[in-house]
């Protein structure tokens, strides 16, 4: 998926020496300018990865409840991966994540998906917030910091 421009007047990321600081990433498809809310909003690769975690069951009565948090988690973490790789790094270079949730009950799904991108523990802060831009459909926002080898 294309990186797209930030939704407001800010930088998506800033590299200073070997440090890469990323603004909070949310699950908005930049091409469609739409919040990711279902598995069908993700590429097939993502759906396949999520199936390995027990998501994307094909059962509407299950997927309708699990999809928003799992899909947004994958989208956000994959976007962070894309930003890091564009700067010549890898996800293993990400050492700190600050994760914002509209409802902490979404954390378990996010944590399972995070394991696909960060198999080793990282420095982590988790915060529950009341709202996020651009709409109430946004459930998860993650900012990341990476140390990139020259």
Would you name each region that the model predicts?
Residues 1-150:
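Short, polar/acidic, helix-capping and beta-turn segments at strand->helix junctions
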């Amino acid at each position: 998926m294309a990186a797209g421009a930030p939704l407001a007047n800010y930088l998506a990321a800033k590299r200073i020496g070997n440090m890469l600081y990323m603004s909070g990433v949310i699950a908005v498809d930049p091409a469609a300018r739409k919040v990711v809310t279902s598995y069908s909003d993700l590429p097939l690769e993502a759906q396949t990865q999520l199936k390995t975690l027990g998501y994307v069951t094909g059962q509407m009565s299950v997927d309708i409840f699990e999809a928003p948090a799992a899909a947004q988690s994958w989208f956000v973490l994959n976007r962070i991966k894309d930003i890091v790789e564009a700067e010549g790094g890898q996800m293993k270079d990400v050492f700190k994540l600050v994760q914002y949730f509209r409802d902490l009950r979404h954390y378990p799904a996010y944590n399972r998906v995070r394991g696909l991108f960060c198999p080793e523990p990282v420095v982590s802060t988790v915060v529950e917030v009341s709202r996020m831009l651009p709409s109430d459909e946004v459930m998860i926002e993650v900012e990341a910091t990476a140390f990139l080898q020259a």
